[in-house]
Amino acid sequence: LDFQFWIHNLQIPESVDLLVIGYGSTLRCDDSVGLRVADTIEAMNLPGVHTLTCNLLTPELAETISQASRVVFVDAAVDAEGEIQLRELVPAKSSQIFAHAAEPGTLLAMARDLYGRAPRAWCLAIPVDNLQIGEELSEKAQRGLTLAVEIIRKLAE
C-alpha cells in the first residue's frame, strides 16, 4: 500500500460559520466514516459550511481552524457504546504535540496560541464495528453516518 498524508480542501472562504473536519482512513472500512460524513455535507452545499477531510489531524490544520466560527471534528469511535456522541471540546492546556498526529483539543490550543483564536468546537464520535482492510461500511457505521449528517445539518441552521 502506498500511504501518503493528505488534507483535502485546506483553504477556507472568509465567511465560514461551521467547519466540518472529517478524518480517518479510506483503507480501513468503518474508519472512513468521518471522511464520508464530510463528503456528504460538502455535497449538500449548506450555506456558511465548509468541509475538510484528512487522514490525520496535524498542526497544519491550526490556522484553518482559527478562521472558522465553529468546528466539528468527525471520527470513527471503536469504544463508543453504540450511540453517536457529540461532545463539546475545550482547548488543551498545551499546544505541544508529542506524536505523529494531534488530538482536537491540542489543535484548538494551537489555533489559540499561534493565531489568537480558538473557535467553539465539538467532537462527533461515530460508533463503528469494523476496522479491517477494505472499503465497506458496517450497518452500525452507516446508521451513524446518517445520524451525524443530520446533527451537522441542525448545527448549521
Where do the PLM segments sit?
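N-terminal catalytic or cofactor-binding beta/alpha core of small enzyme domains
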Residues: W6, L10-V128, E135-L147, I151-E157
